[in-house]
Amino acid sequence: MSTRSVSSSSYRRMFGGPGTSNRQSSNRSYVTTSTRTYSLGSLRPSTSRSLYSSSPGGAYVTRSSAVRLRSSMPGVRLLQDSVDFSLADAINTEFKNTRTNEKVELQELNDRFANYIDKVRFLEQQNKILLAELEQLKGQGKSRLGDLYEEEMRELRRQVDQLTNDKARVEVERDNLAEDIMRLREKLQEEMLQREEAESTLQSFRQDVDNASLARLDLERKVESLQEEIAFLKKLHDEEIQELQAQIQEQHVQIDVDVSKPDLTAALRDVRQQYESVAAKNLQEAEEWYKSKFADLSEAANRNNDALRQAKQESNEYRRQVQSLTCEVDALKGTNESLERQMREMEENFALEAANYQDTIGRLQDEIQNMKEEMARHLREYQDLLNVKMALDIEIATYRKLLEGEESRISLPLPNFSSLNLRETNLESLPLVDTHSKRTLLIKTVETRDGQVINETSQHHDDLE
């Protein structure tokens, strides 16, 4: 409901609309004066009555009525000095009743006014209490919630920064370990290639050793065959020598003196020497060749043995390095897995803490929103109380004007009913006056905003009945 409608409705409720009766209007009082004239020609009293009504705007409502009475006795005329005091008694009784009703209405108005004053005081006290609570809530909410929110935000930022630094440090360590692992893997690949090359070289050396062993065996067989051939030739030579010696002994007796015969012994000796020299030379050459071959093969075998021993040593060294690198790789894998597990746990903890912080932030924001809504509700209640207070102030001012008007009306002198102006009047000659009721309606509209009056208008309406 707007301020204008509240003010208008309260004003209409207090003063009544165009259709309200005189009994329901508690803010209207009447003073009735009556004048009656008589004529001696006929008994037709003419009554003129004026009613003055005080309204909130200071206007007066006037009612005039004329009553025409016709009698069945047209020839009777009253004297001027004969007075009927029953009319005065009726007027006094009506005035007393009016005054009694006015007193009752004034008492009711005073009671309502006292109730309104008590209500206004109570509402003002409630307004002060609500204002104090509002100020207290503003101060406490701003100080407590703001400080708590800022402190928690600083703590959250600090933890987020710490977790970010820890995460960056772990990522750097992980990158370093990954680089070390890559370097060790490259080194392992190189060592494995060198090992394969050494094994291939060793295999070739083994092939050479096998070939040398086969060549040595072949040479040994050749030496044995040559020795057997030399023994056979020597045996054959000895047999030939023995045969020749036997032939020489058999033909020794047949000597021709006349003919000079060659020296067979010298020839045989020469042949033997020649064969011996050839055999010795062949034997020497065979021994030299065998010795040279054996020396070459021995030297090659020694070289191959040295190379094999060196290859074995290198292979053992490579094997030890491979084992150590494998152990180191396994250790690094374990360390990497543990670091990755720790990193996952830290990420999960970080996500959980971030979710908790988000929940805390959301809860604090909800509390802040609830506090804002509560403050807005208190402000609306305060605005409603201000509107009610303004309406009550307007009603109090209206009652004050009514009371002042009533006091000013009561202070007027009362009419003297004993000195009535009676004169003789012919009622037949008087025109018939229609009964009319004139009423002035004052509509006062007050617009307020934030407890301040921004517009005030008044309208007067004159109605006739």
Swiss-Prot record:
GO terms for biological process: cellular response to lipopolysaccharide; cellular response to muramyl dipeptide; intermediate filament organization; intermediate filament polymerization; positive regulation of epithelial cell migration. The modification Phosphoserine is found at residues 5, 7-10, 21, 25-26, 34, 39, 42, 46, 48, 50, 54-55, 65, 71-72, 82, 86, 143, 213, 225, 298, 324, 408, 411, 418-419, 429, 437, 458. There is a cross-link at residues 103, 119, 128, 138, 222, 261, 293, 312, 372, 438, 444 (Glycyl lysine isopeptide (Lys-Gly) (interchain with G-Cter in SUMO2)). Residues 407-465 are annotated as: Tail. Residues 95-130, 153-244, 302-406 form a coiled coil. The modification Phosphotyrosine is found at residues 52, 60, 116. There is a cross-link at residue 444 (Glycyl lysine isopeptide (Lys-Gly) (interchain with G-Cter in SUMO1)). SMART domains: Filament. Residues 131-152 are annotated as: Linker 1. The modification Phosphothreonine is found at residues 20, 425, 435, 445, 457. Residues 268-406 are annotated as: Coil 2. Residues 153-244 are annotated as: Coil 1B. It holds the Pfam family Filament. Residues 1-57 are annotated as: Disordered. Glycans are attached at residues 7, 33-34. The central alpha-helical coiled-coil IF rod domain mediates elementary homodimerization. Homomer assembled from elementary dimers. Identified in complexes that contain VIM, EZR, AHNAK, BFSP1, BFSP2, ANK2, PLEC, PRX and spectrin. Interacts with BCAS3. Interacts with LGSN. Interacts with SYNM. Interacts (via rod region) with PLEC (via CH 1 domain). Interacts with STK33. Interacts with LARP6. Interacts with RAB8B. Interacts with TOR1A; the interaction associates TOR1A with the cytoskeleton. Interacts with TOR1AIP1. Interacts with TOR1AIP1. Interacts with DIAPH1. Interacts with EPPK1; interaction is dependent of higher-order structure of intermediate filament. This is Vimentin. The lineage of its organism: Eukaryota, Metazoa, Chordata, Craniata, Vertebrata.
